[in-house]
Amino acid sequence: MWMPPPHMIDATFSGEVSAQEAQRYTSLLSAESPQAVLEATRWLCEVDTRHVDAPALIFAVRADPLVPLKGTHALAEAIGATIVILENTGHGIPLNPVWANVTAQIDPWLRATTTQ
């Protein structure tokens, strides 16, 4: 079984998450099989992005060691997505206090995108 190393856990709960919250969420982590980790963290199939024809809004974290910003920018460019770079947060965006900021940006984007 595999557990994420401490630096990956720290990256998940970095930024504005309090030490107490980070510890609480860390205590909920459970060991995974190496196969499950591989499937969850590697792109196992290729997608021809030339055929993606839908509006997309991508949220990325500037200092995310799990999903490098360079790759996120490349995806956004390839599919013509709007990209929002988040500061002072870790990979676990839904667990961070910035989540309210993220959700506040979705509705205006949807309205602007669907009325074009």
Q: What is each stretch, according to the model?
A:
Residues 82-116:
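Catalytic active-site module of serine/aspartate enzymes centered on a nucleophile-bearing elbow/loop
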Residues 1-54:
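Alpha/beta-hydrolase
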Residues 33, 64-65:
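Glycine-rich nucleotide phosphate-binding loop and flanking beta-alpha elements
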Residues 23-26, 73, 103:
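Generic structural signal for individual residues within well-ordered alpha-helical segments
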Residues 65-74:
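Conserved alpha/beta-hydrolase "acid-adjacent" motif
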Residues 52, 58-60, 64:
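Short beta-strand/loop motif that positions the catalytic acidic residue
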Residues 78-79:
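Short, structured coil segments at secondary-structure junctions
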